[in-house]
Amino acid sequence: MGKLTLLLLALLVWLQYSLWFGKNGIHDYSRVADDVAVQQATNAKLKARNDQLFAEIDDLNGGQEAIEERARNELSMTKPGETFYRLVPDATKRAGGPAQNNR
């Protein structure tokens, strides 16, 4: 009975060592689970970006309004007879308040 107990105890120690420190053990599992979570977050961001790009492609393929909007915003194009006005914010508002005079 003593040899069987010793053999079972040795087997238990070996199994515990393999579980905690061996290949595909608890540490590897937690590391891979963290890697999977990071990859899923990255994939979700890229999927949202792809969906946005596909929607933009559909808009551009669908009609002239999207093309016209892009031409107006990115190239500052206007229709004949229109006047283009660019509104520039006041320099004092951009700097965070009125300019102070140091005397």
From Swiss-Prot:
Main location group: membrane
Membrane-topology descriptor: Single-pass type II membrane protein
Gene: ftsB
Origin superkingdom: Bacteria
Residue spans, topological domain Cytoplasmic: 1-3
Record has Coiled coil as a keyword: yes
Subcellular location: Cell inner membrane
InterPro entries registered for this protein in UniProt: Cell_div_FtsB (IPR023081), FtsL/DivIC (IPR007060)
Periplasmic side: 22-103
Record's subunit section: Part of a complex composed of FtsB, FtsL and FtsQ.
Protein name, UniProt field: Cell division protein FtsB
